[in-house]
From Swiss-Prot:
Modification N-acetyltyrosine occurs at: 1
Keyword Secreted: yes
Protein name in the entry: Beta-endorphin-2
Keyword flag Transferase: no
Cystine bridges: none
SMART domains to which the protein is assigned, alphabetical: Op_neuropeptide (SM01365)
Membrane spanning stretches: none
Amino acid sequence: YGGFMKSWNERSQKPLLTLFKNVIIKDGQQ
């Protein structure tokens, strides 16, 4: 269970962080 959650977090965290950074950049440009 713990290993599954860890691998899932590692896989899903990078796209989420990229999306989050893109939103911050867009908000800053507006």
